[in-house]
């Protein structure tokens, strides 16, 4: 991505993988080639995220099992954070654990109270292979943890238990986008 360009303006919107798609439930592979295809992938990810009104998107959510995510997310002070991380590692998640509403572009229209730390630090690389360290607090910390979970083969409903889990899984089973892909409620 060129410095100063608006992310996603040159990208193409790709279809989203939905809950139950195997690509969402398997760990993603490390990126080994920082060439032009990676930059195009990131542009497509931004375009897809913006088209779906999201604040974050992992590569496996568009069917690409690589360790990459993009974000355009505010923190609790309404400071906007925009960027991408290649081969991210969640190196810190600490502070207060808060249960808050969490949704996902791969479960459109659904949300559940999900516990997350209110501070997170992610390290990785840019599309050019330059090291990057991202610190998030509040809502942005939630976003960073959510996207890292995706790359490890998880979705937020995996972190929800009890009646909240049963409720969101029932809602997923009844959702118009579900074509018998969602796992049965436990």
From Swiss-Prot:
Keywords: Hydrolase, Iron, Metal-binding, Protein biosynthesis
Pfam families in the cross-refs: Pep_deformylase
Catalytic activity, reaction form: N-terminal N-formyl-L-methionyl-[peptide] + H2O = N-terminal L-methionyl-[peptide] + formate
The UniProt record lists the keyword S-adenosyl-L-methionine: no
Binding site for Fe cation: 104, 146, 150
EC number(s) reported in the record: 3.5.1.88
Cofactor(s) essential for the protein: Fe(2+)
GO molecular function, one term: peptide deformylase activity
Cofactor note: Binds 1 Fe(2+) ion.
Enzyme class per UniProt: hydrolase
Keyword set includes Transmembrane helix: no
Family: Belongs to the polypeptide deformylase family.
Protein name: Peptide deformylase 2
Species for this entry: Streptomyces avermitilis (strain ATCC 31267 / DSM 46492 / JCM 5070 / NBRC 14893 / NCIMB 12804 / NRRL 8165 / MA-4680)
Name of encoding gene: def2
């Amino acid at each position: 991505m060129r410095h100063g360009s608006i992310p996603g303006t040159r990208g193409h919107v790709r279809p989203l993988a939905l809950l139950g798609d195997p690509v969402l439930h398997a760990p993603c592979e490390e990126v080994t080639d920082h060439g032009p295809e990676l930059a195009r992938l990131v542009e497509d990810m931004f375009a897809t995220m913006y088209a779906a009104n999201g604040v974050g998107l992992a590569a496996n959510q568009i069917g690409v099992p690589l360790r990459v995510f993009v974000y355009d997310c505010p923190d609790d002070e309404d400071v906007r954070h925009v960027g991408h991380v290649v081969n991210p590692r969640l190196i810190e998640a600490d502070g207060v654990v808060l249960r808050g509403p969490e949704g996902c572009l791969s479960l459109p229209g659904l949300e559940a109270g999900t516990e997350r730390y209110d501070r997170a630090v992610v390290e990785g690389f840019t599309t050019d292979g330059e090291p990057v360290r991202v610190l998030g607090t509040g809502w942005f910390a939630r976003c960073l943890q959510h996207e890292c979970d995706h790359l490890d083969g998880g979705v937020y409903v995996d972190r929800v238990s009890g009646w909240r889990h049963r409720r969101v899984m029932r809602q997923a089973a009844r959702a118009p986008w579900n074509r018998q892909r969602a796992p049965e409620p436990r």
